């Protein structure tokens, strides 16, 4: 018998595709450490090699657009750290990794730690812009946390002296390289916050390798910078060097010299600003005086224009103009009123009702005469019809019949007697005659026989 539900059947292509999707989606991007072997670079520029350790190996491919960023030439037997995506080459079913970046093993481990710490602190929000403190403008005192013998301190002091010689500088000397450097940098930041002598801090050093700059990728240093109440400007290495301290600091400067320029005012620029402000002030004063003079002249002219005699003369002239306008307006109004009166008189004469009244009265008299004639004719005809109707009614009236000797007898219930079967002995009858009524009682009822009809002759 067949099972109730058949199992899923994969083709080879579908199986390889499914495995590839599982590897790519479930594993994602990973870091792998191993030894290079079987390294080849065909004309396409891509790299193909095997990455192995003591017990296993895996095929690797690094395409040209990725390997051109590698700063060294991979060698057979070299230990490296790679960042790669796991996939499967479907036509052959070969499991392999696609390398995105490659570093020598020692430096690669540091880079891996760097990426892990960066992701951790970013997830905690230490890099968020909302926590960045604004720098003072201008700064009244600058604190410098760096090596007292390094080139970075020399560059910072040189720039500050050139730009703003009067700006106080407090140096918090500390080691910037080695195992003790992170702890010393943290203590220097905490000391600067405790003493609260300056309103901005420069934390940094000169350039170097990733190992040389590693103190500024230390988690303790990053958290000390984040916790500082005083704004911190990071100035580590060269412009291409980016450390964890740069992400946490309130502002990143590409070099120590650039940091000194950020926190200081340019004395020459300040002098130019003062001179420019002085020029603007002089121009503003000249403009103000010219404006006041022009305003005074306008007011003086207005006062002259508003002298009482001039005012009276203008009012007199205006009064005369108004009188002329009023006289002209009255004349025009009277003229228009007279013309309108003439037009109305003509219209009234044209619409005089007397002729129409006379014609209406004549028409009424004619209608009254015709109405009277019509009423007389109708009344005469009605009287004639009434007389004929009376004569006809008298001819068919029951009273006339009674007057000729006939009578009408009715039973007690008022029904007119037509047959003897309507009464019985003892009933009271009412007989109406021509000149009165006779009430009688029935003593006997006799029915007469109808005469037989004669038979027709054959």
Swiss-Prot record:
Any one Gene Ontology cellular component term annotated for this protein: exodeoxyribonuclease VII complex
User: Which compartment or compartments is the protein found in?
Assistant: Cytoplasm
Any one GO molecular-function label of the UniProt entry: exodeoxyribonuclease VII activity
Q: Which UniProt keywords apply?
A: Cytoplasm, Exonuclease, Hydrolase, Nuclease
Biological process per Gene Ontology, one example term: DNA catabolic process
The catalysed reaction is: Exonucleolytic cleavage in either 5'- to 3'- or 3'- to 5'-direction to yield nucleoside 5'-phosphates
* UniProt-listed Enzyme Commission number(s): 3.1.11.6
What sort of enzyme, by top EC class, is this?
hydrolase
The text of the family note is: Belongs to the XseA family.
Assembly, per entry: Heterooligomer composed of large and small subunits.
Q: What does this protein do?
A: Bidirectionally degrades single-stranded DNA into large acid-insoluble oligonucleotides, which are then degraded further into small acid-soluble oligonucleotides.
Its name, as the record gives it, is Exodeoxyribonuclease 7 large subunit
Lineage, please? Answer: Bacteria, Pseudomonadati, Pseudomonadota, Gammaproteobacteria, Enterobacterales
Name the gene that codes for it. Answer: xseA
């Amino acid at each position: 018998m067949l099972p109730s539900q058949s199992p899923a059947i994969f083709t080879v292509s579908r199986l390889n595709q499914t495995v590839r999707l599982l590897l790519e989606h479930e594993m994602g991007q990973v870091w792998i450490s191993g030894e290079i072997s079987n390294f080849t670079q065909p004309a396409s520029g891509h790299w193909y090699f095997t990455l192995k350790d003591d017990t296993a190996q895996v095929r690797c491919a690094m395409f040209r657009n990725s390997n051109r960023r590698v700063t060294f030439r991979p060698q057979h037997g070299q230990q490296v750290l790679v960042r790669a995506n796991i996939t499967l080459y479907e036509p052959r079913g070969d499991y392999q990794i696609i390398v995105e970046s490659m570093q020598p093993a020692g430096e690669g481990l540091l880079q891996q730690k760097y990426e892990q710490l960066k992701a951790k602190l970013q997830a905690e929000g230490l890099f968020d812009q909302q926590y960045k403190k604004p720098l003072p403008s201008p700064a009244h005192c600058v604190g410098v946390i760096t090596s007292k013998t390094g080139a970075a301190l020399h560059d910072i002091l040189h720039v500050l002296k050139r730009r703003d010689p009067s700006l106080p500088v407090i140096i918090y000397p500390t080691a910037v390289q080695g195992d003790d450097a992170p702890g010393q940098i943290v203590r220097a930041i905490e000391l600067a916050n405790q003493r609260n002598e300056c309103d901005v801090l420069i934390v940094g050093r000169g350039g170097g390798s990733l190992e040389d700059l590693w103190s500024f990728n230390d988690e303790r240093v990053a958290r000390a910078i984040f916790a500082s109440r005083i704004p911190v400007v990071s100035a580590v290495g060269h412009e291409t060097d980016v450390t964890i301290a740069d992400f946490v600091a309130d502002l990143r400067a590409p070099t120590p010299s650039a940091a000194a320029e950020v926190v200081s005012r340019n004395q020459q620029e300040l002098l130019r600003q003062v001179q420019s402000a002085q020029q603007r002030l002089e121009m503003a004063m000249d403009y103000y005086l010219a404006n006041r003079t022009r305003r005074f002249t306008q007011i003086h002219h207005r006062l002259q224009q508003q002298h009482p005699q001039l005012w009276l003369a203008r009012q007199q002239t205006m009064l005369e103009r108004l009188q002329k306008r009023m006289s002209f307006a009255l004349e025009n109004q009277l003229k228009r009123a007279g013309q309108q009166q003439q037009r109305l008189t003509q219209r009234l004469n044209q619409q005089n009702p007397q002729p129409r009244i006379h014609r209406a009265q004549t028409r009424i008299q004619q209608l009254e005469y015709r109405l009277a004639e019509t009423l007389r004719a109708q009344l005469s005809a009605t009287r004639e019809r009434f007389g004929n109707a009376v004569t006809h009614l008298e001819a068919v009236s029951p009273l006339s019949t009674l007057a000729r000797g006939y009578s009408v007898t009715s039973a007690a219930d008022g029904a007119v007697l037509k047959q003897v079967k309507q009464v019985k002995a003892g009933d009271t009858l009412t007989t109406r005659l021509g000149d009165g009524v006779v009430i009688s009682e029935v003593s006997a009822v006799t029915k007469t026989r109808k005469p037989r009809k004669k038979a027709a002759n054959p």
